Amino acid sequence: MKVLLIGSGGREHALAWKIAQSPRLTKLYAAPGNPGIAEEAAIVDLHTENHEDVVDFCRTHAIDFVVVGPEAPLVAGLGDVLRAADIPTFGPSAAAAQLEGSKGFTKDLCARYGIPTGAYRRFTDAEPAKAYIREEGAPIVIKADGLAAGKGVTVAMSLDEAFAAVDECFAGAFGAAGAEVVVEAYLDGEEASFFCLCDGKSVLPLASAQDHKRVGDGDTGPNTGGMGAYSPAPVMTAEMVERTMKEIIEPTVRGMAESGYPFTGVFFAGLMITEKGPELIEYNVRFGDPECQVLMMRLESDLLPLLYAAATGTLEGMKAEWRDEAALTVVMASRGYPGAYEKDTPIAALPDASAATKVFHAGTAMKGGGLVAAGGRVLNVTATGKTVGEAKDAAYAAVRDVSWENGFYRNDIGWRAVARETA
Protein backbone atom coordinates (compact mmCIF):
# COMPACT_ATOMS: atom_id res chain seq x y z
CA MET A 1 0.00 0.00 0.00
CA LYS A 2 1.33 3.46 -0.96
CA VAL A 3 0.54 6.02 1.74
CA LEU A 4 0.76 9.83 1.89
CA LEU A 5 1.00 11.34 5.38
CA ILE A 6 0.08 15.02 5.76
CA GLY A 7 1.76 17.00 8.55
CA SER A 8 5.07 18.10 10.04
CA GLY A 9 4.89 17.77 13.83
CA GLY A 10 5.84 15.31 16.52
CA ARG A 11 2.48 13.60 16.12
CA GLU A 12 3.17 12.99 12.44
CA HIS A 13 6.68 11.71 13.17
CA ALA A 14 5.13 9.18 15.58
CA LEU A 15 2.53 8.17 12.97
CA ALA A 16 5.21 7.88 10.27
CA TRP A 17 7.40 5.75 12.56
CA LYS A 18 4.50 3.39 13.31
CA ILE A 19 3.12 3.23 9.74
CA ALA A 20 6.64 2.51 8.44
CA GLN A 21 6.66 -0.71 10.52
CA SER A 22 3.62 -2.11 8.67
CA PRO A 23 4.20 -5.14 6.42
CA ARG A 24 1.35 -3.80 4.26
CA LEU A 25 3.28 -0.62 3.41
CA THR A 26 5.11 -0.46 0.09
CA LYS A 27 5.98 3.27 0.07
CA LEU A 28 5.43 6.12 2.54
CA TYR A 29 5.45 9.77 1.44
CA ALA A 30 5.06 12.77 3.75
CA ALA A 31 4.31 16.45 3.20
CA PRO A 32 5.62 18.81 4.40
CA GLY A 33 7.40 16.54 6.90
CA ASN A 34 10.43 17.32 9.08
CA PRO A 35 13.94 15.85 9.51
CA GLY A 36 12.65 13.12 11.82
CA ILE A 37 9.86 12.11 9.46
CA ALA A 38 12.48 12.04 6.67
CA GLU A 39 14.02 9.01 8.41
CA GLU A 40 10.78 7.08 7.80
CA ALA A 41 9.28 8.57 4.62
CA ALA A 42 10.08 10.26 1.33
CA ILE A 43 9.51 13.98 1.90
CA VAL A 44 7.42 15.65 -0.80
CA ASP A 45 7.50 19.36 -1.69
CA LEU A 46 3.73 19.70 -1.73
CA HIS A 47 1.61 22.71 -0.76
CA THR A 48 -1.02 20.82 1.20
CA GLU A 49 -3.28 23.87 1.53
CA ASN A 50 -3.80 23.60 -2.24
CA HIS A 51 -6.10 20.58 -2.24
CA GLU A 52 -5.96 19.99 -5.99
CA ASP A 53 -2.16 19.71 -5.80
CA VAL A 54 -2.59 16.94 -3.23
CA VAL A 55 -5.10 15.13 -5.48
CA ASP A 56 -2.74 15.46 -8.47
CA PHE A 57 0.16 14.05 -6.45
CA CYS A 58 -1.96 11.11 -5.30
CA ARG A 59 -3.01 10.30 -8.86
CA THR A 60 0.49 10.68 -10.29
CA HIS A 61 2.04 8.45 -7.61
CA ALA A 62 -0.86 5.94 -7.38
CA ILE A 63 -1.42 6.69 -3.68
CA ASP A 64 -3.74 4.13 -2.06
CA PHE A 65 -4.39 5.94 1.21
CA VAL A 66 -3.92 9.41 2.73
CA VAL A 67 -3.50 9.97 6.48
CA VAL A 68 -4.13 13.57 7.59
CA GLY A 69 -2.36 14.36 10.87
CA PRO A 70 -3.22 17.97 11.87
CA GLU A 71 -6.64 19.52 12.43
CA ALA A 72 -6.36 22.55 10.12
CA PRO A 73 -6.43 20.63 6.78
CA LEU A 74 -9.38 18.57 8.06
CA VAL A 75 -11.38 21.65 9.03
CA ALA A 76 -10.44 23.16 5.64
CA GLY A 77 -11.98 20.14 3.89
CA LEU A 78 -8.94 18.30 2.51
CA GLY A 79 -10.54 14.96 3.36
CA ASP A 80 -13.70 15.85 1.41
CA VAL A 81 -11.71 16.77 -1.71
CA LEU A 82 -9.65 13.56 -1.58
CA ARG A 83 -12.69 11.34 -1.02
CA ALA A 84 -14.50 13.07 -3.89
CA ALA A 85 -11.52 11.99 -6.03
CA ASP A 86 -11.99 8.38 -4.78
CA ILE A 87 -8.84 8.48 -2.65
CA PRO A 88 -9.41 6.78 0.74
CA THR A 89 -8.51 9.27 3.49
CA PHE A 90 -8.17 8.98 7.26
CA GLY A 91 -9.82 11.97 8.90
CA PRO A 92 -13.32 13.44 9.11
CA SER A 93 -15.20 15.61 6.64
CA ALA A 94 -15.07 19.38 7.15
CA ALA A 95 -18.64 19.21 8.49
CA ALA A 96 -17.73 16.52 11.04
CA ALA A 97 -14.48 18.33 11.92
CA GLN A 98 -16.66 21.05 13.46
CA LEU A 99 -16.42 18.89 16.59
CA GLU A 100 -12.99 20.49 16.99
CA GLY A 101 -13.40 23.51 14.72
CA SER A 102 -16.28 24.98 16.74
CA LYS A 103 -16.55 24.67 20.52
CA GLY A 104 -20.12 25.97 20.29
CA PHE A 105 -21.11 23.26 17.78
CA THR A 106 -19.84 20.57 20.16
CA LYS A 107 -21.53 22.05 23.23
CA ASP A 108 -24.84 22.25 21.35
CA LEU A 109 -24.46 18.59 20.30
CA CYS A 110 -23.83 17.64 23.94
CA ALA A 111 -26.96 19.51 25.01
CA ARG A 112 -29.09 17.74 22.36
CA TYR A 113 -27.83 14.24 23.16
CA GLY A 114 -27.47 14.46 26.94
CA ILE A 115 -23.67 14.15 26.89
CA PRO A 116 -22.23 15.23 30.27
CA THR A 117 -20.33 18.51 29.98
CA GLY A 118 -20.07 21.83 31.82
CA ALA A 119 -22.96 24.33 31.57
CA TYR A 120 -22.24 26.96 28.92
CA ARG A 121 -23.38 29.97 26.88
CA ARG A 122 -22.23 31.23 23.45
CA PHE A 123 -21.49 34.92 22.77
CA THR A 124 -20.57 37.08 19.79
CA ASP A 125 -20.22 40.29 21.82
CA ALA A 126 -18.11 41.13 24.87
CA GLU A 127 -20.65 42.90 27.09
CA PRO A 128 -23.27 40.10 27.30
CA ALA A 129 -20.42 37.63 27.89
CA LYS A 130 -19.12 39.73 30.78
CA ALA A 131 -22.62 40.09 32.23
CA TYR A 132 -22.99 36.29 32.21
CA ILE A 133 -19.55 35.89 33.82
CA ARG A 134 -20.58 38.32 36.59
CA GLU A 135 -23.70 36.21 37.23
CA GLU A 136 -21.78 32.93 37.32
CA GLY A 137 -18.65 34.11 39.16
CA ALA A 138 -15.12 32.67 39.05
CA PRO A 139 -13.48 30.26 38.48
CA ILE A 140 -14.91 30.06 34.96
CA VAL A 141 -13.62 28.97 31.55
CA ILE A 142 -13.39 31.21 28.45
CA LYS A 143 -12.87 29.56 25.05
CA ALA A 144 -12.38 31.00 21.58
CA ASP A 145 -14.92 29.12 19.45
CA GLY A 146 -12.53 28.15 16.63
CA LEU A 147 -9.05 26.68 16.19
CA ALA A 148 -6.37 28.54 18.13
CA ALA A 149 -3.46 26.04 18.19
CA GLY A 150 -4.33 24.91 21.71
CA LYS A 151 -4.00 28.44 23.12
CA GLY A 152 -7.58 29.75 22.91
CA VAL A 153 -8.70 28.53 26.35
CA THR A 154 -8.42 30.49 29.60
CA VAL A 155 -9.26 28.93 32.95
CA ALA A 156 -9.98 32.20 34.74
CA MET A 157 -9.62 32.12 38.52
CA SER A 158 -10.90 35.71 38.90
CA LEU A 159 -13.48 37.93 37.19
CA ASP A 160 -10.73 40.29 35.97
CA GLU A 161 -8.89 37.38 34.33
CA ALA A 162 -12.14 36.24 32.69
CA PHE A 163 -12.94 39.73 31.38
CA ALA A 164 -9.39 40.07 30.00
CA ALA A 165 -9.77 36.72 28.19
CA VAL A 166 -13.06 37.84 26.62
CA ASP A 167 -11.47 41.13 25.51
CA GLU A 168 -8.47 39.26 24.08
CA CYS A 169 -10.74 37.06 21.95
CA PHE A 170 -12.88 39.89 20.62
CA ALA A 171 -9.81 42.10 20.02
CA GLY A 172 -8.66 39.57 17.43
CA ALA A 173 -5.90 37.74 19.31
CA PHE A 174 -7.05 34.49 17.71
CA GLY A 175 -8.33 35.94 14.44
CA ALA A 176 -11.61 34.51 13.17
CA ALA A 177 -11.38 31.75 15.82
CA GLY A 178 -12.24 34.35 18.47
CA ALA A 179 -15.21 35.92 16.68
CA GLU A 180 -17.42 33.83 18.97
CA VAL A 181 -16.69 32.94 22.58
CA VAL A 182 -17.97 30.03 24.65
CA VAL A 183 -18.17 30.67 28.39
CA GLU A 184 -18.52 27.48 30.40
CA ALA A 185 -18.55 26.20 33.96
CA TYR A 186 -15.27 25.31 35.61
CA LEU A 187 -15.12 21.56 36.23
CA ASP A 188 -13.13 20.34 39.22
CA GLY A 189 -11.40 16.99 38.86
CA GLU A 190 -8.59 15.24 37.03
CA GLU A 191 -8.11 15.65 33.28
CA ALA A 192 -7.58 12.71 30.94
CA SER A 193 -7.57 12.11 27.20
CA PHE A 194 -9.33 9.14 25.61
CA PHE A 195 -8.90 8.03 22.01
CA CYS A 196 -11.15 5.94 19.72
CA LEU A 197 -11.26 5.17 16.03
CA CYS A 198 -14.61 5.53 14.26
CA ASP A 199 -15.79 4.61 10.76
CA GLY A 200 -19.12 6.47 10.94
CA LYS A 201 -20.93 3.60 12.70
CA SER A 202 -18.51 1.34 14.58
CA VAL A 203 -16.14 2.54 17.29
CA LEU A 204 -12.85 0.96 18.35
CA PRO A 205 -11.59 2.17 21.75
CA LEU A 206 -7.84 2.80 21.74
CA ALA A 207 -6.22 4.02 24.96
CA SER A 208 -6.05 6.82 27.51
CA ALA A 209 -3.37 9.41 28.12
CA GLN A 210 -2.80 12.46 30.28
CA ASP A 211 -1.43 15.70 28.87
CA HIS A 212 0.34 18.56 30.65
CA LYS A 213 -0.92 21.82 29.15
CA ARG A 214 0.74 24.43 31.36
CA VAL A 215 4.24 25.57 30.47
CA GLY A 216 5.72 25.39 33.98
CA ASP A 217 6.39 22.82 36.68
CA GLY A 218 3.49 22.29 39.07
CA ASP A 219 1.04 23.10 36.27
CA THR A 220 1.87 26.81 36.39
CA GLY A 221 2.09 29.49 33.70
CA PRO A 222 0.16 29.87 30.45
CA ASN A 223 -1.41 27.05 28.44
CA THR A 224 0.57 25.52 25.59
CA GLY A 225 -0.06 22.91 22.92
CA GLY A 226 1.21 20.39 25.50
CA MET A 227 4.51 19.99 27.38
CA GLY A 228 4.39 16.24 27.90
CA ALA A 229 2.11 13.25 28.26
CA TYR A 230 1.93 9.70 29.49
CA SER A 231 -0.22 6.65 28.79
CA PRO A 232 -2.20 4.98 30.19
CA ALA A 233 -3.84 7.50 32.55
CA PRO A 234 -4.46 5.71 35.88
CA VAL A 235 -7.62 7.77 36.46
CA MET A 236 -9.15 6.02 33.41
CA THR A 237 -10.06 2.77 35.15
CA ALA A 238 -11.95 0.02 33.30
CA GLU A 239 -15.19 1.38 34.80
CA MET A 240 -14.37 4.94 33.69
CA VAL A 241 -13.56 3.75 30.15
CA GLU A 242 -16.88 1.89 29.99
CA ARG A 243 -18.78 4.96 31.20
CA THR A 244 -16.93 7.21 28.75
CA MET A 245 -17.91 4.93 25.86
CA LYS A 246 -21.57 4.69 26.91
CA GLU A 247 -22.17 8.24 28.13
CA ILE A 248 -19.94 10.28 25.80
CA ILE A 249 -18.50 8.49 22.74
CA GLU A 250 -21.48 6.38 21.62
CA PRO A 251 -24.04 9.24 21.91
CA THR A 252 -21.62 11.45 19.94
CA VAL A 253 -21.33 8.89 17.12
CA ARG A 254 -25.12 8.57 17.03
CA GLY A 255 -25.63 12.33 17.22
CA MET A 256 -23.19 13.06 14.42
CA ALA A 257 -24.80 10.43 12.15
CA GLU A 258 -28.31 11.70 12.90
CA SER A 259 -27.18 15.29 12.28
CA GLY A 260 -25.96 14.30 8.81
CA TYR A 261 -22.24 14.43 9.69
CA PRO A 262 -21.16 10.79 10.18
CA PHE A 263 -17.75 10.84 11.84
CA THR A 264 -14.78 8.91 10.46
CA GLY A 265 -11.29 9.18 11.88
CA VAL A 266 -10.06 9.49 15.45
CA PHE A 267 -12.08 10.84 18.35
CA PHE A 268 -9.85 12.51 20.93
CA ALA A 269 -12.06 13.23 23.92
CA GLY A 270 -10.63 15.69 26.43
CA LEU A 271 -12.28 14.64 29.69
CA MET A 272 -12.56 15.85 33.25
CA ILE A 273 -13.08 13.02 35.72
CA THR A 274 -15.26 14.66 38.38
CA GLU A 275 -17.12 13.29 41.40
CA LYS A 276 -20.01 12.58 39.01
CA GLY A 277 -17.86 10.66 36.54
CA PRO A 278 -16.47 11.55 33.10
CA GLU A 279 -17.49 14.93 31.64
CA LEU A 280 -16.50 16.20 28.20
CA ILE A 281 -14.25 19.27 28.09
CA GLU A 282 -13.67 19.21 24.33
CA TYR A 283 -13.33 17.01 21.27
CA ASN A 284 -10.41 16.96 18.90
CA VAL A 285 -10.66 15.23 15.54
CA ARG A 286 -7.02 14.09 15.26
CA PHE A 287 -4.50 12.34 17.44
CA GLY A 288 -3.25 14.53 20.26
CA ASP A 289 0.19 16.07 20.15
CA PRO A 290 2.08 14.90 22.27
CA GLU A 291 -0.40 12.14 23.28
CA CYS A 292 0.01 10.39 19.92
CA GLN A 293 3.68 9.83 20.67
CA VAL A 294 2.99 7.80 23.83
CA LEU A 295 0.12 5.89 22.19
CA MET A 296 2.31 4.82 19.27
CA MET A 297 5.07 3.65 21.66
CA ARG A 298 2.52 1.38 23.41
CA LEU A 299 0.59 0.11 20.36
CA GLU A 300 1.45 -3.53 19.59
CA SER A 301 -0.87 -3.85 16.58
CA ASP A 302 -0.15 -2.77 13.03
CA LEU A 303 -1.52 0.79 12.84
CA LEU A 304 -2.05 0.97 9.07
CA PRO A 305 -4.97 -1.52 8.73
CA LEU A 306 -6.72 0.10 11.71
CA LEU A 307 -6.56 3.56 10.11
CA TYR A 308 -7.62 2.15 6.73
CA ALA A 309 -10.60 0.34 8.30
CA ALA A 310 -11.75 3.57 9.98
CA ALA A 311 -11.49 5.37 6.63
CA THR A 312 -13.36 2.70 4.64
CA GLY A 313 -16.22 1.70 6.95
CA THR A 314 -14.75 -1.70 7.86
CA LEU A 315 -13.82 -1.18 11.52
CA GLU A 316 -16.33 -3.65 12.98
CA GLY A 317 -14.54 -6.65 14.49
CA MET A 318 -11.10 -4.98 14.47
CA LYS A 319 -9.00 -5.03 17.65
CA ALA A 320 -6.04 -3.02 18.91
CA GLU A 321 -3.44 -4.79 21.05
CA TRP A 322 -1.40 -2.78 23.56
CA ARG A 323 1.89 -3.41 25.31
CA ASP A 324 1.44 -3.93 29.04
CA GLU A 325 3.68 -1.00 29.90
CA ALA A 326 3.60 2.75 30.28
CA ALA A 327 5.01 5.39 27.94
CA LEU A 328 5.94 8.99 28.76
CA THR A 329 7.08 11.87 26.57
CA VAL A 330 8.83 15.10 27.57
CA VAL A 331 8.45 18.06 25.20
CA MET A 332 11.58 20.15 24.74
CA ALA A 333 10.64 23.66 23.64
CA SER A 334 12.43 26.83 22.54
CA ARG A 335 13.08 29.29 25.37
CA GLY A 336 10.29 31.87 25.45
CA TYR A 337 7.57 29.47 24.25
CA PRO A 338 4.56 29.86 24.26
CA GLY A 339 5.52 33.51 23.77
CA ALA A 340 8.17 34.87 21.39
CA TYR A 341 11.20 32.64 20.90
CA GLU A 342 14.40 32.60 18.87
CA LYS A 343 14.37 30.41 15.76
CA ASP A 344 17.11 28.38 14.09
CA THR A 345 19.07 27.67 17.28
CA PRO A 346 21.42 24.69 16.79
CA ILE A 347 20.71 21.23 18.22
CA ALA A 348 24.19 19.73 18.49
CA ALA A 349 23.35 16.17 19.53
CA LEU A 350 20.45 13.78 20.14
CA PRO A 351 20.50 10.55 22.16
CA ASP A 352 20.63 7.26 20.29
CA ALA A 353 17.26 5.55 19.90
CA SER A 354 16.72 2.23 21.68
CA ALA A 355 13.88 -0.26 22.03
CA ALA A 356 12.60 1.77 25.00
CA THR A 357 13.53 5.33 23.96
CA LYS A 358 12.70 7.42 20.89
CA VAL A 359 13.09 11.12 20.09
CA PHE A 360 10.27 12.36 17.88
CA HIS A 361 10.92 15.56 15.93
CA ALA A 362 8.38 18.39 16.04
CA GLY A 363 9.62 21.90 15.15
CA THR A 364 12.98 20.92 13.67
CA ALA A 365 14.67 21.73 10.35
CA MET A 366 18.00 21.22 8.60
CA LYS A 367 20.03 24.39 8.03
CA GLY A 368 23.62 24.61 6.85
CA GLY A 369 23.97 20.87 7.20
CA GLY A 370 22.93 20.86 10.86
CA LEU A 371 19.75 20.28 12.85
CA VAL A 372 18.08 23.45 14.19
CA ALA A 373 15.02 24.33 16.25
CA ALA A 374 12.47 25.87 13.89
CA GLY A 375 9.40 26.02 16.14
CA GLY A 376 8.09 26.44 19.67
CA ARG A 377 7.76 22.77 20.56
CA VAL A 378 10.81 21.09 19.07
CA LEU A 379 11.54 17.57 20.36
CA ASN A 380 9.43 14.88 22.06
CA VAL A 381 11.73 12.65 24.09
CA THR A 382 9.73 9.48 24.65
CA ALA A 383 10.35 6.30 26.64
CA THR A 384 8.57 3.19 27.90
CA GLY A 385 8.79 1.35 31.21
CA LYS A 386 6.96 -1.11 33.42
CA THR A 387 5.47 1.86 35.32
CA VAL A 388 5.00 5.57 34.56
CA GLY A 389 7.81 6.24 37.05
CA GLU A 390 10.17 3.94 35.16
CA ALA A 391 9.20 5.51 31.81
CA LYS A 392 9.72 8.97 33.33
CA ASP A 393 13.23 8.11 34.55
CA ALA A 394 14.17 6.75 31.11
CA ALA A 395 12.73 9.76 29.28
CA TYR A 396 14.53 12.32 31.48
CA ALA A 397 17.79 10.37 31.18
CA ALA A 398 17.46 10.75 27.40
CA VAL A 399 16.53 14.45 27.74
CA ARG A 400 19.85 15.02 29.53
CA ASP A 401 21.63 13.58 26.49
CA VAL A 402 20.14 16.23 24.18
CA SER A 403 22.67 18.96 23.43
CA TRP A 404 20.58 22.09 22.76
CA GLU A 405 21.41 25.24 24.71
CA ASN A 406 18.21 27.10 23.83
CA GLY A 407 15.84 24.33 24.92
CA PHE A 408 13.78 24.02 28.08
CA TYR A 409 11.35 21.46 29.47
CA ARG A 410 9.17 20.68 32.45
CA ASN A 411 10.78 18.52 35.12
CA ASP A 412 7.59 16.93 36.46
CA ILE A 413 5.82 15.20 33.56
CA GLY A 414 3.82 12.28 34.96
CA TRP A 415 3.76 13.58 38.54
CA ARG A 416 0.16 12.56 39.21
CA ALA A 417 0.69 8.97 38.08
CA VAL A 418 4.04 8.67 39.88
CA ALA A 419 2.40 9.93 43.10
CA ARG A 420 -0.26 7.22 42.72
CA GLU A 421 2.36 4.54 42.06
CA THR A 422 4.42 5.48 45.12
CA ALA A 423 1.51 6.13 47.52
Swiss-Prot record:
InterPro entries: ATP-grasp, ATP_grasp_subdomain_1, PreATP-grasp_dom_sf, PRibGlycinamid_synth_ATP-grasp, PRibGlycinamide_synth, PRibGlycinamide_synth_C-dom, PRibGlycinamide_synth_C_sf, PRibGlycinamide_synth_CS
Binding site for Mg(2+): E282, N284
Cofactor binding note of this UniProt entry: Binds 1 Mg(2+) or Mn(2+) ion per subunit.
Lyase listed as a keyword: no
Domain ATP-grasp: residue ranges: 107-312
Alphabetically ordered keywords of this record: ATP-binding, Ligase, Magnesium, Manganese, Metal-binding, Nucleotide-binding, Purine biosynthesis
Catalytic reactions of this protein: 5-phospho-beta-D-ribosylamine + glycine + ATP = N(1)-(5-phospho-beta-D-ribosyl)glycinamide + ADP + phosphate + H(+)
Cofactors named for this entry: Mg(2+); Mn(2+)
The UniProt record lists the keyword Nucleotide-binding: yes
Molecular functions per Gene Ontology: ATP binding; metal ion binding; phosphoribosylamine-glycine ligase activity
Entry-linked Pfam families: GARS_A, GARS_C, GARS_N
A GO BP entry: 'de novo' IMP biosynthetic process
Family recorded in the similarity comment: Belongs to the GARS family.
Protein name from the UniProt record: Phosphoribosylamine--glycine ligase
Organism: Rhizobium meliloti (strain 1021) (Ensifer meliloti)
